[in-house]
C-alpha cells in the first residue's frame, strides 16, 4: 500500500509516533517519504551485508527482522520481515519504536540525509490531525 501523506500522518499519530522519543510526526513523515515513498511494500537489497530493508520504514533484516536468508541476523524486533510490509503498519511502527529507542532517529540514513537540519513542517502541512 502506498499511503497518501496525510493519511499516513494520521495513522502514525494514532499509533503513538508523534513526539515518540522526542521525534516529531513531521520528522517521521520525512523519514518514511525518503526511505520508501510511503510504500509498505518497498524492499531494497544491500549486497555488502547481504541484508534487505523492508517496508515503509525500510527496516533491516540483519538487525531487526527475520527474512530467513540474511547471514548472522539478529532479529531485534522479533518479527518476520514480511510482517513489516503489511498494509496494516502496526508491527512496522512497533519495530520503528524499538529502533529509535535503542539507536535514535539517526539509525535511518535517509533521515540524516534529507530531514536533519531541514524544515520538515511541510510534511504535515494541511493535514487534519
From Swiss-Prot:
PANTHER family: LYSOZYME C
Reaction equation(s) it catalyzes: Hydrolysis of (1->4)-beta-linkages between N-acetylmuramic acid and N-acetyl-D-glucosamine residues in a peptidoglycan and between N-acetyl-D-glucosamine residues in chitodextrins
Other notes: Lysozyme C is capable of both hydrolysis and transglycosylation; it also shows a slight esterase activity. It acts rapidly on both peptide-substituted and unsubstituted peptidoglycan, and slowly on chitin oligosaccharides.
Keywords for the protein's UniProt record, in alphabetical order: Antimicrobial, Bacteriolytic enzyme, Digestion, Disulfide bond, Glycosidase, Hydrolase
GO biological process annotation, one example: digestion
Family, as annotated: Belongs to the glycosyl hydrolase 22 family.
Protein name: Lysozyme C-1
Organism: Capra hircus (Goat)
Matches recorded under Pfam families: Lys (PF00062)
Domain C-type lysozyme: 1-129
Active site: 35, 53
